[in-house]
Amino acid sequence: MILPIYTLGQPVLRKVAEDIPTDYPNLQQLVADMYETMAASDGIGLAAPQIGKSIRVVVIDLDPLSEDFPEYKGFHHAYINPHIIEVDENAPMATMAEGCLSLPGIHEKVTRPTRIHVKYLDEELQPHDEWVEGYLARVMQHEFDHLEGHVFTDRITPFRRQLIKNKLKAVNEGRFRCGYKTKS
């Protein structure tokens, strides 16, 4: 089922999400709905707070980028109770433009670490403890930020935030257009 995307201004986007128990009701259906919602919105990542649930569940599908990133062919994963454990301080930082389904029409350059250590459960509730780098590390950080009550514009410079304040205000007030169902 395609769910509405919660946009900036919805309180759930500013809450720290809770870990869920492994017997969370209808988890597989929730993950399936998140994948369907993300695909219908032309996204590559979606966190549960973006659909109004303050729980630590994220889906990422990088297959649409596989023409530019062949290593992501067929890549789609769910992350249950994910946490960033550590950032590789020796790895370089990288700056790239980011956008977000919860901030329609806003794109800004964000600087992030290129290598992170994460722990999570997969869709079968199997534990993973791994270092992730490159573009996947960026997408994970963006989505995991939602679980901590942050959006990507929290990570831009105050000067850039000032320049886009009217766009942010418009999204916050529900004055925007996009091609997917939203809740503002």
Show the residue positions of the predicted features.
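Active-site rim/adjacent substrate-binding subdomains
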Residues: 1-141, 146-184
